[in-house]
Amino acid sequence: EIRLSLVGSEMCIRDRACEGTYIGDETLLDTTITGAVIDSRQVKEGYLFIPIKGERVDGHKFIPTVFEQGAAIVLSEHELKDPAGPYVLVESTTDAMKKLAAFYRKSLDIKVVGITGSVGKTSTKEMISSVLEQKYSVHKTAGNFNNEIGLPLTIFGIRESHQVAVLEMGISDFGEMHRLSTMSCPDVMVITNIGYCHLEFLGDRDGVLKAKTECFEHMMPDAVAVLNADDDKLATVQTVNGKPAIYYGKESASDVHKSVYTTN
């Protein structure tokens, strides 16, 4: 179970999580949601369906279908005529999904490792996950689910059995990392490098650094930042939220460095 209760301590969709208006049978408010998806084909019994307006398809058109498939509740940006189940009326289903993800993450007793950088995010995620899986139950970002749609879906996939979540976060513009890290609230934040990606929005590498380090504002109180010492831009970051950053790199002066290199 994802344990997003429609009312109570875990998740109150109506009041505490997405600030919408509940419309439907009041006796269903204690229903427990067992999953949350944006793809109507993935809806199962007890799921929350979040319809997203895309360039070609509006997910709202599938609301009747998902109720037939057993959806417990849906979100909607407009009032529904004779729906087969309850729904929460919200201004933006995308924004509501982010609020739900942020609320759910904060309700979990789990450590979160956030990973970002211009390149190397996915391989770093896989390496960190592989090491942690030797001792812990790990939930990690699947594929490229690292943006403002994919990250909340990844967070919804966390279960009580998981001890660590390794979350990849990708951005292309200012403000995106702010929104992503608001949802993920990392305990450890890894930045692989500051490159030349998305300069059409970020201007130059200093802009990339500024955008990537927006994540520092939303780290957990005792969180640590792990930065690449071999990156000239990241090397300028001395402290993060009053604490020294942990540096890794090729040189022995780094806090963590390689002593042996092998290739297959």
Stretches with model-predicted labels:
Residues 96-229, 233-243:
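Phosphate-binding loop of NTP-binding sites
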